[in-house]
Amino acid sequence: MKASATGRILMWRGGSLWIGLAGEPAGMHAHHAVQITLPFNGGGARFQVPGEPWTNYSAAIVAAQQPHAFEARGQMMAQIFVEPESRDGRALQLLHRAQGIAALDDSISSEVEALAAAFESRATGTALIELAHSAIRKLVGPSQSTATPPDARIAQALELIRERLSGPVSLKPIAQAVHLSPDRFRHLFMEETGVGFRPYVLWQRLDCSLAAYVKGSTLTEAAHDGGFADSAHFSRTFRKMFGIAPASVRPE
């Protein structure tokens, strides 16, 4: 989706909303976030996982790290990405941990209609983000209160990673800062986030660069904001994690 008159990308701590007209198909990719795909006006989207045929969905949730390709060209829709270590993400993982891609029923239809209407009426970013959170809350229901809170040391480590993205981020200094041995930290980090330390840092770099890019930075400027060596590294990482080129979400 282009972040233009036909689409917007809105980001918050722990998630983002991509809303508008779906563009080019996304090749096989995998990302750290849980993905919630909500086509508008009774439309649909197609997903493919490795070794399987394409499957149609009227709405779907994709688990974190699940490889998939995606196609919904010309379809108006919302895509909500939720980091699995966030409170909402932990609740979503609790509900859908055994399923790579799962269909969503029409119990969320009113939230989808509200998102569609708000986008059509050019609602503010704040209003759209609140509607995205409403959709997430509808999906997680009571499970949010039963999700295990993150380990405090890993929560602190995640903060430190975000603070250091403009430069090198390595495991040993972060482990020392939260008073864990590197080996114990590596194990606990994987246990808490579902991903290794280096891939998580790369995801956070991508998130930081994307936030800058959709606000109008050039590819090179956005790459440097996230600590990438250059725009080529940013572009390769973006395609690996989203299946499309960053130019596909070019800002206005």
Pin down the residues of each PLM region.
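Short hydrophobic/aromatic patch on the recognition helix
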Residues: 185, 189, 233-234, 238
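Short coil turns linking two alpha-helices in DNA-binding domains
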Residues: 181, 229-230
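Short, Lys/Arg-enriched, Trp-marked, Pro/Gly-tolerant hinge/linker segments that flank
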Residues: 99-178, 191-199, 203
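N-terminal regulatory/effector-sensing and dimerization cores
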Residues: 2-98
